[in-house]
Amino acid sequence: MPEFIWRSVLILQASTAIYTAGPAFWGLVNSAWNLCTIGKRQSPININTSQIIFDPFLPPLRLTMEGKKVSGTMINTGRHVIFRLDKQNPVNISGGPLLYNHRLEEIMLHFGSENGIGSEHFMNKESAAGEVQLIHYNQDLYNNVSEASRNPNGLAIISLFINVADNSNPFLNRMLNRETITRISFRNEANFIQDLSIEELYPESFGFLTYQGSMTIPPCYETVTWIIIDRPLNITSMQMHSLRLLSQNQPSQIFQSMSDNFRPVQPLFHRGLRGNLDFRKPGRKCKGANYKLHVDRLMSSKNLD
C-alpha cells in the first residue's frame, strides 16, 4: 500500500468513476469503504456552538519546527489541491487535545462553486467559502500516515475556514498567486514551492474546538482528532476564482471544475464537542480567546545562517 493514502483520487484502487459517484454511494460501491455508510463517528459535522463544552484545561497548541521555512509540492490530484511537505524541515503539532506528537504531512483545500458553500464543516448550519485542512499523523505511535490512518489516535487534522475578502493570508497568497496556480491547472500537474512559513496559517490569537471524527474521503477511517480554529483565513475573490478554474481532468479531456469538493455533513450522534473558550458567549472574553500558538524551533546545522 502506498505510504500516503491521501495522495490519489484512486484510493484503494477505486476508479475515478466510482469515487466521483458521490459521497452517498462510497460505502455501497466498495466494501472497504463501509465505514463511510455505517460509521457513527463520521466527519464533517455541523457544529452547534450551544453544544460545545467549555474546557479551561485545554492547553495551547504547540508547533515544533526544524528551521524557519518549509518547502513542498503543490498538486492537482483531480479532486483536491494539496500541498505536500518535503521531509527536510519537519513540522510537528502537539498540545490542545493531543496526547502525542503529530507530524504535518500535507495541506488540503476544499472550496465551492459559490462563496456561500465550500467548507466541509458547518458552524450553526452555515458554510464558509472553503476550508483549509492541515493533516498530521501520530509519529509517536506509527511509522507513516498510511499506518496511522487505520489505527486509534492516528491522525490529527487542524481545520481553518476560508473567507473571501479584499486581502489574503500570506501563506495562501504564496500558494494561490497566478504564477503558482496556473502551473497546476489540470489533474496530476504539480509545482514545487519553497520558503513558506507554516506559522502564517495560524491567527495571531485564536480559540479552537475539538471532537473525535473520521477522514472525509474514503475509506472514512474513524481515527481523526479534529481541531477547528475559530478564526478564518482570507483569500481574495480573484484567488477563489483561480481555484474554481482548476480542472478535475487532463488537458485532452472536457473541462470539469474541481470546486464543490467537499463531503456533506454527517450526524453527530452522541459525540461531545469541547472548546478552549465559551462559544456560547461570543461577547465574553475568557482565557481561551487569547490563546496564541507556541512555536519551538529546533535549529540544525543546515538551517543556520
Residue ranges, per PLM feature:
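Alpha-carbonic anhydrase
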Residues: M1-D305
